[in-house]
Amino acid sequence: MECDVINRILNEEDLFDCIKRKSKLTYEVNVGNVIIGGNNPIVVQSMALGGSGDANKDAHEVLELAKAGSELVRVAVNSEQAIKNIPYIRDVLVDNGFDHKMIIGCGQYEIARLVKEYPECASALGKIRINPGNIGFGNKRDKNFEDVIEFAIKYDIPIRIGVNWGSLDKYLASKLMNDNALLSNPKPDYIVLQKALVISAVTSAKRAEEIGLSKNKIVISCKTSKIQDLIPVYTVLSNVCNYPLHLGLTEAGSGIKGVVGSVAGISYLLLNGIGDTIRVSLTQQPGESRTTEVKLCQEILQSIGLKNFNAQVTSCPGCNRTNPKYFHQLVKDVNDYIADRMPVWRNTNPGAKDMVVAVMGCIVNGPGESKHANLGISLPGYGERPVAAVYQDGEKLCTLEGKNIFEQFVSIIENYVSVNYQ
């Protein structure tokens, strides 16, 4: 029996083939210099808080997100002042070296009127997001949708059709619920609503094409607040259409809850080959920067091996085999040092984003983990000789001792970066 199990492990390669790389290519949608879909890297998006009424303040909030690594930044276009600010925000981005088309206008029921009344301002947008559930009500719904699509066609602007669980088309949801109630074996309400999300998105996209918008100008999202709804909805979307998919939980929440929910849902979909662009929609903690959601997107992509942004520090939790106070401080210091240096290395040594540095607490896993990293340091455990072994590319490089181990180790890191990532 044991031999059969081992033979299966050794010979059945499909057992380990549980992560799906993207096999179905979606249409490529150009948003300025950023390409969403196809075989291109996953695009990181964010949304500015905005709404201050101060164009300069709003522009610098967008700029902060761009500097943090957001490739596209969404702003709410919900008033005359908001849309009038768009050209100024664009100019601030351009003056700081960013693409002139990285701003996404997020419109709800007022977007049709605003793009019609202020076309010179709206044309500065790189993409427009519209919500089929509230772009208009009654007999205005279809007309408003058509007006925005025609504007997008005229100014060559891509559209994201963003369907949300909390603002789902009431007419469509009601019809599907009523039809379901007449069945001899009705489906649960949540399944009917999942179907309504997908139908709303796909039929809206097809309607946009009928009006004249090219299929490579359309991105789709169907956001829910629960992972167990998000996954089936996007799985079906991926099966029934070729539009690029924008992933994210809506109303994810704040703190650990929002982080865990977003990471769980987005990571699952990406590891199953679904998704072209992502946003983590966190409720900010008081005083927290909006750039947190950008960093989380980057960490998701880096953690699952899709895209590197920063040198990675691997470390154990520490235990009573080592001096936890000293070890935890060393891990923090190395992390802080690399975070401070990455903005410089991106310009002078861009390959440093692929570097892995291991900081380990003792001999149990320290040498092994350090050998798997580009650079690694393994501290001595209690009762061991007070020296720290350093490994480089799998080989022992030297041992460090004394009170300035951190300074010695970062000197080794700097030398490695300058030699290997020129």
From Swiss-Prot:
Catalysis performed (reactions): (2E)-4-hydroxy-3-methylbut-2-enyl diphosphate + oxidized [flavodoxin] + H2O + 2 H(+) = 2-C-methyl-D-erythritol 2,4-cyclic diphosphate + reduced [flavodoxin]
Cofactor binding summary note: Binds 1 [4Fe-4S] cluster.
InterPro entries named among the record's database cross-references: Dihydropteroate_synth-like_sf (IPR011005), IspG_bac (IPR016425), IspG_bac-typ (IPR004588), NO2/SO3_Rdtase_4Fe4S_sf (IPR045854)
Signal peptide positions (record): none
GO BP, one annotated term: terpenoid biosynthetic process
Cofactor: [4Fe-4S] cluster
Entry superkingdom: Bacteria
Keyword line: 4Fe-4S, Iron, Iron-sulfur, Isoprene biosynthesis, Metal-binding, Oxidoreductase
MF terms in GO: 4 iron, 4 sulfur cluster binding; 4-hydroxy-3-methylbut-2-en-1-yl diphosphate synthase activity (ferredoxin); 4-hydroxy-3-methylbut-2-enyl-diphosphate synthase activity (flavodoxin); iron ion binding
Pathway given in the UniProt record: Isoprenoid biosynthesis; isopentenyl diphosphate biosynthesis via DXP pathway; isopentenyl diphosphate from 1-deoxy-D-xylulose 5-phosphate: step 5/6
Entry's EC annotation: 1.17.7.3
Pfam families on file: GcpE (PF04551)
Residues that, per the record, bind [4Fe-4S] cluster: C316, C319, C362, E369
Function: Converts 2C-methyl-D-erythritol 2,4-cyclodiphosphate (ME-2,4cPP) into 1-hydroxy-2-methyl-2-(E)-butenyl 4-diphosphate.
Family per similarity comment: Belongs to the IspG family.
Protein name: 4-hydroxy-3-methylbut-2-en-1-yl diphosphate synthase (flavodoxin)
Organism whose genome encodes this protein: Ehrlichia canis (strain Jake)
Lineage: Bacteria, Pseudomonadati, Pseudomonadota, Alphaproteobacteria, Rickettsiales
